[in-house]
Amino acid sequence: MNKVYSLKYCPVTGGLIAVSELARRVIKKTCRRLTHILLAGIPAICLCYSQISQAGIVRSDIAYQIYRDFAENKGLFVPGANDIPVYDKDGKLVGRLGKAPMADFSSVSSNGVATLVSPQYIVSVKHNGGYRSVSFGNGKNTYSLVDRNNHPSIDFHAPRLNKLVTEVIPSAVTSEGTKANAYKYTERYTAFYRVGSGTQYTKDKDGNLVKVAGGYAFKTGGTTGVPLISDATIVSNPGQTYNPVNGPLPDYGAPGDSGSPLFAYDKQQKKWVIVAVLRAYAGINGATNWWNVIPTDYLNQVMQDDFDAPVDFVSGLGPLNWTYDKTSGTGTLSQGSKNWTMHGQKDNDLNAGKNLVFSGQNGAIILKDSVTQGAGYLEFKDSYTVSAESGKTWTGAGIITDKGTNVTWKVNGVAGDNLHKLGEGTLTINGTGVNPGGLKTGDGIVVLNQQADTAGNIQAFSSVNLASGRPTVVLGDARQVNPDNISWGYRGGKLDLNGNAVTFTRLQAADYGAVITNNAQQKSQLLLDLKAQDTNVSEPTIGNISPFGGTGTPGNLYSMILNSQTRFYILKSASYGNTLWGNSLNDPAQWEFVGMNKNKAVQTVKDRILAGRAKQPVIFHGQLTGNMDVAIPQVPGGRKVIFDGSVNLPEGTLSQDSGTLIFQGHPVIHASISGSAPVSLNQKDWENRQFTMKTLSLKDADFHLSRNASLNSDIKSDNSHITLGSDRAFVDKNDGTGNYVIPEEGTSVPDTVNDRSQYEGNITLNHNSALDIGSRFTGGIDAYDSAVSITSPDVLLTAPGAFAGSSLTVHDGGHLTALNGLFSDGHIQAGKNGKITLSGTPVKDTANQYAPAVYLTDGYDLTGDNAALEITRGAHASGDIHASAASTVTIGSDTPAELASAETAASAFAGSLLEGYNAAFNGAITGGRADVSMHNALWTLGGDSAIHSLTVRNSRISSEGDRTFRTLTVNKLDATGSDFVLRTDLKNADKINVTEKATGSDNSLNVSFMNNPAQGQALNIPLVTAPAGTSAEMFKAGTRVTGFSRVTPTLHVDTSGGNTKWILDGFKAEADKAAAAKADSFMNAGYKNFMTEVNNLNKRMGDLRDTNGDAGAWARIMSGAGSADGGYSDNYTHVQVGFDKKHELDGVDLFTGVTMTYTDSSADSHAFSGKTKSVGGGLYASALFESGAYIDLIGKYIHHDNDYTGNFASLGTKHYNTHSWYAGAETGYRYHLTEDTFIEPQAELVYGAVSGKTFRWKDGDMDLSMKNRDFSPLVGRTGVELGKTFSGKDWSVTARAGTSWQFDLLNNGETVLRDASGEKRIKGEKDSRMLFNVGMNAQIKDNMRFGLEFEKSAFGKYNVDNAVNANFRYMF
């Protein structure tokens, strides 16, 4: 470029100036004359000549990659990024780009010489006369200049393009134009950045230059200082590359940068604006650049000149009829009597086409002729429908639909032409049949709703391209466009499947901006059957073979002339030897001869490229989102599928059938330097990617979650291999270029924790699946006939785990923390440096509370050095531990967590197993190599154990299970404040053997006997053996509650024989009153159920007296709560239904009836908790004498279904049935004080029978039993009631209140307790209480009544705290 001017050296300026090729002699003479002009006049004189600015001289102490990334918005320089640090090559901070958010340079053309300022216009300098086209973004679309629009007097032009640019957003243009000193105002313009592609140099602090590349090789960018001059021209000195006033990244324009932009950040408008284009510089060794400020008036006028008169549709006058004469390039839009002339392409002149703007609500246009509008576009300010007569088409620069508009487009295009669409509004494609034209959209919404022709053919477009990140294309149905012809260009856009099922055989996505989504309520089915490959192969370049050897690209084609014949070779290695002697051309490891026919050689290379592509992995850089399921069948040729974009399918399933699937992060793209790849496997900077779906379904697949990827999904695996935290990674060596994907496979291990992959969800493994966890994991695992291997130090099982026929191994620094219980029918293995932590479940929104959890396994194998097993914070673990290597076992914690009350049955069960300790283990520890520590913990020996060392603090070690005795062998024992519980059958016992050293104090030695010792029996059984010299005070006899007794062993210490032994002599046993009281309270629950029924026995007969003896069907519901000593409380709901009949006799009314009852009660105390459900029935009779006397009789049977859990003596949960009988009689006399007021003395006697019950179980190895026999309560009651009746014309209410004394005449049942120390009998007691009641009965209708009563008792051992009785009666 820059062909209009040549460069000449001017000694006055110390640099080059641009002169016309037609004026060389004049300029030479002028330069000579400049030597006589004062230095102060130099700037003005230099500006008289159009010096060519020729481009990028930058600091040598900053990595050149920084300047490249800056220019292309890559690396750190993402648009909008703030406070970007700039470091030199030694890692020292040079400065920060903190005065403005990072600018978006996408509006700068790919060659850096022009900038897009409107969808169809660019700006540059007019002396750039050589370029005829521009491209943007990744340069895949080329736009032709149809009019250069050169400024008449200054070095500036604003060319018009043939099409609307869809890839990028135009740059905003300064609103201040050439206003004097405007850009020196730093309060408004806070930063100045430039980008260009001129000749590249680096400069050191001594001013030495090193050339990097020639002009237009690539773009660089950087900072410039505040302008020294600001008017129609901006002048500054970015060539002073180490001067801080130019910012941390100064970039001095040099040869090739003419027309490149200068951007300024407008703080007032909060956006970057282009203010000028680069015109000149002061020479390679100079410092000054000159920019021409954008002449905004001229620019606006240029764009305005390309518009025809606006068209205003008037509703009610019919459609706009559009006729067009291709020969003249003119047409007419007419509506009624009004006409608008338009201009289209004239011959080959695209610029003859003018833009049309349409307004008017709900407009309609009909094309009568095909319209070729050239570079003219259509802009719709309002919603329109555009249709065409049969076969008529439209072509032009494109369509703009303004925000809020919906344009229905019923016009087909032309093959080979693309409809370019911009604007935030909607364009609905609604033509008929097959549209051979394509679509390129860069903004707004395009709805594809093409209609079928008479043959049923539909095609909205032959191809669709989305770019710039702004557009959305919505599929009306699955036939609108061949999915394989949909592509996403620079920054992409959204393809909305709109509830349709769509199949892709290839994905053409340039970058992360490519989005496939579904926003419809109907779920879409997306099939990625990625078997197709790109068959477009560029013509390979042919390199020359150096006779002296050299380097090249393996697989590329080279040629050499030998004996006057051109021979073609394919290079096999990265370098090759000389071809003169030791001819390397004959070495098959270096070269492959492919003949002397150029065309055949070229085709051979192409065929091999295609063959290679058939095996290449598929990399999708884009995004899958919305309401859809995605299926990926096996890809032919074993090709792998890699996602380095993202997936967000919260309610969707992604399924992979066979083959390899990889989710990974994305390497940060950097600008290429001299052909370098934009990304590499060994780079340090990667972008995180998120993958979210409801379910990831894998069948016969190999799945990898690699670096910088986060997966949030459940996984269902069938015969598949899952690697979480894989080091496997792929990069696309064409990433960010928009070219065909060139994958490179390798390994990439993250350097920081934040770059590691992470998984959250629940995994189900089936049918020989394998799971390798090498990264952060949170969730659950269920494995069936599968294998799990953990090497990650950060694996958290938050859901209950199940392993059936499956292995679980933690090794190589892996750490598994389980928080919610686990089941395994096999052994869990910890290898070298592997750690397993079993914990309770953290309680949400608390700092240190944990709910207990149970871990049931067949065992734990500690097979590698430094393996560790930790049982802590409310965990109960069972399963033998075998330590075959030096390892550690920790039970409990010296800083124990607070155990929360159980909210689930599983948690309650786990809590009961802890027995008040912070953690518990049940099993043996073998191997002799484990170091075991216990803090506030319980270890129940499940078998003989051998360990290296044992440290015990405030803990308990006991032996339980079958009647086999256990031996604990430990080399070194350190125990303090702990409890050791051993068993004996009076002949043998559990034993503790310490072989090397025993230390500690305040330890209790307790003995649980399995047989009842004879009075005064001497035992002489060794319990603990320790090395000689061990303190005799280390163990003392402890007292332990076992069953219902407090048992204290009698011991003596024997120091003879070279050991210290603690020997059991016998026992002292006495009843434990607390345990006995709990047992008695449990057994007396039946008495309290009996009293509940007694208090509700005669309610119906009392109602008869209040209702003047009306008989009939009735129903009653009662609810109450009671309490007693020992923390006892109960509550019940009691329902009665019945029917009675009245018999009128001489002087007496006799009522007989039948009743059925149901009671649901629950009870809780310090000793037990549970529920009783009772069902019963009975007969009753009531005699009401005319004198006021009455007699009530009732008989009743009740069956009780009981379910209770005792928390004493290891009772556990018991389910049992009982029954009871009742026979009651009550008599009294109702004396009327007035006609409606009465007093009623009463006396009642209830006799009953309550069935007994017997329980037998074991507390440890001690046999226990509890029994109470059938007993017959006799309960009396005397009292008085006072009542009054209130009545009206159609109603009456009887209110009453009463008090009575209820008392037991017989003791309740005796409880018999038995354990190894003997039998204990607890005699039944009597109870009594004062009852209070208040109630009312109301007549609702003649034959309906409603009653309500409240009761309470006091002064008893068992009292009714409150009771409510509601009844309803229907008389007939």
UniProtKB/Swiss-Prot annotation:
Q: Which GO terms describe its cellular component?
A: cell outer membrane; cell surface; extracellular region; periplasmic space
More info: The S.flexneri genes encoding ShET1 enterotoxin subunits set1A and set1B are contained within the pic gene, on the complementary non-coding strand.
State what protein this is by name: Serine protease pic autotransporter
CDD domains noted in UniProt: PL1_Passenger_AT
- Keyword Secreted attributed: yes
Q: What is known of its domains?
A: The signal peptide, cleaved at the inner membrane, guides the autotransporter protein to the periplasmic space. Then, insertion of the C-terminal translocator domain in the outer membrane forms a hydrophilic pore for the translocation of the passenger domain to the bacterial cell surface, with subsequent cleavage.
Signal peptide as annotated in the record: 1-55
Coiled coil regions in record: none
Q: Which Pfam families match?
A: Autotransporter, Beta-sol_PIC_HAP1_IgA0_2nd, Peptidase_S6
Identify the residue position(s) of the site Cleavage: 1095-1096
Q: What class of enzyme is it?
A: hydrolase
Q: Give the record's PTM text.
A: Cleaved to release the mature protein from the outer membrane.
Q: Where is the Peptidase S6 domain?
A: 56-301
Q: Where is the Autotransporter domain?
A: 1106-1372
Q: Which UniProt keywords apply?
A: Cell outer membrane, Hydrolase, Membrane, Periplasm, Protease, Secreted, Serine protease, Signal, Transmembrane, Transmembrane beta strand, Virulence, Zymogen
Where does the record place the catalytic residues?
127, 155, 258
- Entry keyword annotation includes Secreted: yes
Q: What does this protein do?
A: Involved in intestinal colonization, displays in vitro mucinolytic activity, serum resistance, and hemagglutination. Important to penetrate the intestinal mucus layer.
Q: Which GO terms describe its biological process?
A: proteolysis
**GO molecular function terms noted in the UniProt entry:** serine-type endopeptidase activity
Q: What is its EC number?
A: 3.4.21.-
The cross-references to InterPro entries, in alphabetical order and at most eight, read:
Autotransporte_beta (IPR005546), Autotransporte_beta_dom_sf (IPR036709), Autotransporter_pectin_lyase_C (IPR012332), Bact_Autotransporter_VF (IPR050909), OM_autotransptr_brl_dom (IPR006315), Pectin_lyase_fold/virulence (IPR011050), Peptidase_S6 (IPR000710), Peptidase_S6_dom (IPR030396)
